[in-house]
Amino acid sequence: MTYFFETYQQVVQVIEEQQNRPRYFKKSKDVGELMKEPSTLENFITILSGEDEGHNLSFTEEERQIAQEFFQYNNYYNFSIFPKLLPCQGDKYSYTDALRIYQIDEFLRREIHYFTSRIEKWIKTSVAYHLSHIYESTEYAKAECYLDPALYTSRKTYLETMESFSEALHKSKEPFIEHHFKQRNGCIPIWVLVEELTFGQVDTFLSVLNTDYRNEWSDRVFGRENRKFVLSWISVSRYLRNISAHHSRFYGKKYIVLPRLKKEDMKQYGVTNGDKNTLFVALLVLKSLLSFHSLQVQSEWNLFMDNLEEIFNDNTEIINYPLNGFRENWKSALLIEIVPVNKD
């Protein structure tokens, strides 16, 4: 690989060990595995009507027609989990009930995608702005602070970060990167760099920053009292962003990236460590971050909560509240208390 940054010419590429990684795409005959046969649209309905796989949905003739059209454009495998997310599996629910849960999940995905996108853009902006102003050196310009090994927790994390950044810029098709490469001799200001980094790269960059720099950035953006929690909140936001980008499920999901929460919040909202993998806690983390965003975005978040409450109220018989970590006070916990800016 040819590295983008001139200061990085002598970096040794970090090679990931492959021996212990599982091998996917195995041929079924080679491993004695029986593969399922493809099903027809009508057979999807038959499966959903039966009890063998825990679906047990009822279908009217109209619902059969709706379902056949639906499965022409939506993967049955993706939908098949939703009947199992209805509150009581002993009860007989309709296809419409399961479809409504599916639609609620789509609503959640759209909203969460919007807000995590706002968070991603904001974090990138704040990192570029504050680090370039905090940084002081006689060796590197403020705009290229990320090139300084002293900015990182170790030489190893510095080298790995430079490799990651260099790869991102080499893959870029953006004219402004080409401009800086050809017209600026490859000198990239941090506010240009962050535009080409993924949320994951920025998240990782923050995690390997020298503690003093990271704390100064965090204190300026979120306040000193949140210093211990911010990185985990951002990691959760990044995780939720990825879920939405891949059109994966939010409703009834057990999340695998868990946040650090304030003890007083956990006590006030009745959250236990066992609840940290729920939708409610995921939304609580987004609310915690967005409480430091603009008044406009905070208002949009509260409107999201109003709409979510209306959806829950209209579908209370099919919403599985415990599965998603929601308690009676869920809305008050997730609303942002908006404090107008004093212009005096």
Where does each model-flagged region fall?
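Acidic/aromatic/glycine-rich contiguous surface patches that form carbohydrate-binding/processing clefts
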Residues: 247
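Extended intrinsically disordered or low-complexity regions, especially N/C-terminal cytosolic tails and loops
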Residues: 1-239, 251-344
